[in-house]
């Protein structure tokens, strides 16, 4: 699993120009929790991973379990 910083960068990129409040409300989490996920301070628990993936229309694996091309 990528580290929290990589996951955070992915979440920030997916959010784009959407306000954090919009994403947080849609996923049933606080803005502060989303901020911690996006800044790499915390990794969301599995239930929240699913909610975020659904919101962004992505597979959970695509966001949270990407492998670097040099990993084997």
Segment roles from a protein language model:
Residues 1-17, 61, 65:
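A short, Lys/Arg-rich alpha-helix, primarily the initiator
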Residues 12, 21, 50:
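Active-site phosphate/pyrophosphate- and oxyanion-stabilizing loops and adjacent acidic/basic residues
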Residues 28, 39-41, 68:
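Residue-level detection of the helix-turn-helix DNA-binding "recognition helix"
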Residues 41-54, 70-72:
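Short, basic-rich loop-to-helix N-cap that marks the start of a DNA-contacting helix
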Residues 12, 25, 54:
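Short polybasic/polar patches that bind polyanions
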Residues 17-36:
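Short alpha-helical DNA-recognition segment
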Residues 35-36, 45, 64:
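Key DNA-contacting residues within the recognition helix of helix-turn-helix
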Residues 28, 47-62:
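DNA major-groove recognition helix of helix-turn-helix/homeodomain DNA-binding modules
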């Amino acid at each position: 699993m990528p580290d929290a910083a990589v996951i955070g960068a992915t979440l920030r990129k997916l959010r784009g120009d959407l306000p954090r409040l919009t994403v947080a409300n849609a996923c049933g989490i606080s803005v502060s929790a989303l901020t911690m996920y996006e800044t790499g301070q915390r990794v969301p628990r599995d239930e929240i991973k699913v909610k975020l993936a659904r919101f962004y229309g992505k597979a959970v694996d695509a966001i949270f379990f990407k492998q670097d091309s040099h990993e084997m």
